[in-house]
Amino acid sequence: MWFKNLTVYRFNKPFSVDPDSLEKSLEDFTFSPCSSQDISKFGFSKAMGKHGETLIHTAGDRHLICATKEEKILPSQVIKEALEEKVSQIEAEENRKLAKKEKDAMKDEITTTLLPRAFSRRSQIRALILPEIQMVLVDSSSAAKSEELMALLRKAIGTLPIIPMSFKTPIETQLTEWLKEGKTPAAFEMQDEAELKSDSDEGGIVRFKQQDLSENEVLAHIEVGKQVHKLALHFGQSIAFLLQSDAAIKRLKFSEEFRAGNDDLGNDDPMARLDADFALMSSELIALINATVEALGGLEDSI
């Protein structure tokens, strides 16, 4: 349940959640496994997995949702080889070249034949809906997968007035200033990893890992015009992460000490422990987002 990445959206119109109403809306788009002829299926599943009973888990004004995707694994090379073999056979038998339309129809036929025998894989993606700060946090490093979940949520509830989180000042400008000055806002501590890019196509990209970012070797790249597009940071004593210039927060890692905050509950009641961990995690993520927004100079005015 502990989030590992954050793709952040903000509501550009006031948004509130009625848990019971949202639960009913999600039920119409519940996940069901692929049939023999389905290439993929995507739908909402229990927010707390096998220990939960509902599609939405709520604590205060914080709401967790989860979606499951099943995809058939049908390698394109397998289809290509089967198609080439069939095309060669028919062209030899009929002594003519097949048209593209005929080949496309054959490809569809081959795909339909192979689908029932294909293996499948499942993945899950979660999101935290936070009306109290008017944001949605998606646990994914992929913008495309995050958008897919938001599209499903929008389809379920009819409207979802969100836009990606963006800031008044370009993030790379702020990150470059922090690295240049060797100082971050009080809530954060700079770690030992950064990626710098030049604005020009010829300038290239340079990456530093496990290196003191205050060294002249690093700062020299800033002097010649490169800007920081990725910077490893630590939030208080709780979260390590990589902040990117596109506002994505990746490689989110909660410290062992922080995750142990509910150890006194034990594991006799898994749902009680999950509920407590959800409250702990969501509170700290809200604190992280609020601190990040403040440190980066505030959100861009919504349009």
UniProtKB/Swiss-Prot annotation:
It is found in: Cytoplasm, Nucleoid. One of its GO terms (cellular component) is cytoplasm. The keyword Cytoplasm applies. The keyword Cytoplasm applies. It holds the Pfam family RdgC. Keywords: Cytoplasm, DNA recombination. GO terms for molecular function: double-stranded DNA binding. Transmembrane segments: none annotated. One of its GO terms (biological process) is regulation of DNA recombination. May be involved in recombination. Belongs to the RdgC family. NCBIfam families: PRK00321.1-3, PRK00321.1-5. HAMAP family: RdgC (MF_00194). This is Recombination-associated protein RdgC. It comes from Shewanella pealeana (strain ATCC 700345 / ANG-SQ1). The gene is rdgC.
